[in-house]
Amino acid sequence: MLMDEGMPMSYHEHMGTIIQSEEDVDRFMDMTNKNTFLLYDTGHLMFAEANYERVLKNYISRINHVHCKDIRKDVFLKSIKDDLSFRESFLNGVFTVPGDGCIDYRPLIKILFEEKYQEWLIIEAEQDPKKANPLEYAIIGYNYLSTALKENDYTL
């Protein structure tokens, strides 16, 4: 129905929801048809300790939106050690933009390129603007992703 109107349905896997882990994503994708897409979020998948590269490879044909978000590894490891909730981790600054965290986007960009991905790709940080200047971090993310995209012959 939505597809007939040119509006594909995408589900955003996200911590704190019913679809957050790799297993949740697998089950969701198995229970839905090819007209239901996945909004692929690197930061939330890594936070869920998912194999985010495997998820991308397995579902690339049903991904129509990518949130490029990164994780501050030290904050993430402290969150695990201290058994913090997702909300507490978020408030402590676990998320950042690509190029400022620990996710290597080069293999992910390579998969997107090999599969001729031409859909949405956005930079997302989910961080406190009082602690991390949005423009400054947008530039960090843009520069990092631009380099990774150009290495795979994507044009911006």
Name what the model sees in each region.
Residues 1-9, 107-118, 148-155:
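A structural motif corresponding to the C-terminal end of an alpha-helix
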Residues 69-71, 100, 106, 110-114:
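Catalytic-face loop-and-helix region of soluble metabolic enzyme cores
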Residues 75-76, 129-132:
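Short active-site-adjacent structural elements
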Residues 132-155:
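C-terminal helical cap(s) of enzyme catalytic domains, especially alpha/beta-barrels
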